[in-house]
């Protein structure tokens, strides 16, 4: 696969965003998630708008933008809320999946798994996959080689050279 830098088409009637990535936000609230989705889609919203007011706008925009996969990072932040807030955040994620029929990918720390376990229905919708820590091993070097072949550079960058690979591993903290 090649990475392409495709500029926005000003003549297009609507945005086409097959994969949308958002962060749960520091409070882990349902409203915060909806506001972040609207922000990623450059959509205006009322600063005091409630979750119930924002939700239909988010649905409409996700549909018209062609979103097929919604990636929610920092899912473990839901844990910061009280029981009612956690239930509302998880219910909102569940409703987005139901109403849109899209794939939702949740990312976060091990606490994200605990968060999902608060709602058995939502827990069944997510299959956990653990990402291993990067190290000086065949998998890491293979990934770096694969990335290098995808980068549209004039000259090879040598990502898997020991010196560069060590720097990447150290800077990313594995």
Q: Where would I find each of the regions flagged by the language model?
A:
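P-loop NTPase Walker A phosphate-binding motif
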Residues: 1-14
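Short loop/turn elements that form and flank the Walker-type P-loop nucleotide-binding site
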Residues: 15-16, 64-66, 98-101
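Conserved NTP-binding/hydrolysis module of P-loop NTPases
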Residues: 18-20, 24-46
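Central P-loop NTPase core of STAND/AAA+ ATPases
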Residues: 42-64
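Short, structured loop/turn "capping" segments at alpha-beta junctions
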Residues: 44-48, 68-70, 103-104, 154-155
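Conserved P-loop NTPase "ATPase switch" module shared by AAA+ and STAND
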Residues: 61-85
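The catalytic "switch" region of P-loop NTPases
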Residues: 77-82, 89-170
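The conserved phosphate-sensing helix
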Residues: 172-174
């Amino acid at each position: 696969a090649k990475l392409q830098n495709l500029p926005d088409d000003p003549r297009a009637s609507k945005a086409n965003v097959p994969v949308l990535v958002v962060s749960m936000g520091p409070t882990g609230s349902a409203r915060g998630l909806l506001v972040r989705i609207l922000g990623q889609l450059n959509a205006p919203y009322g600063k005091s708008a409630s979750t119930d007011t924002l939700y239909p706008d988010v649905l409409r925009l996700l549909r018209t933008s062609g979103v097929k996969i919604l990636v929610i990072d920092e899912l473990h932040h839901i844990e910061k809320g009280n029981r009612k807030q956690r239930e509302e955040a998880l219910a909102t994620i569940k409703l987005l999946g139901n109403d849109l029929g899209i794939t939702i990918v949740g990312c976060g720390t091990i606490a994200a798994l605990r968060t999902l376990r608060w709602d058995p229905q939502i827990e069944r919708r997510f299959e956990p996959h653990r990402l291993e820590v990067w190290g000086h091993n065949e998998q890491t070097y293979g990934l770096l080689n694969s990335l290098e072949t995808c980068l549209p550079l004039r000259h090879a960058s040598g990502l898997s050279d020991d010196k560069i690979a060590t720097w990447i591993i150290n800077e990313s903290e594995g």
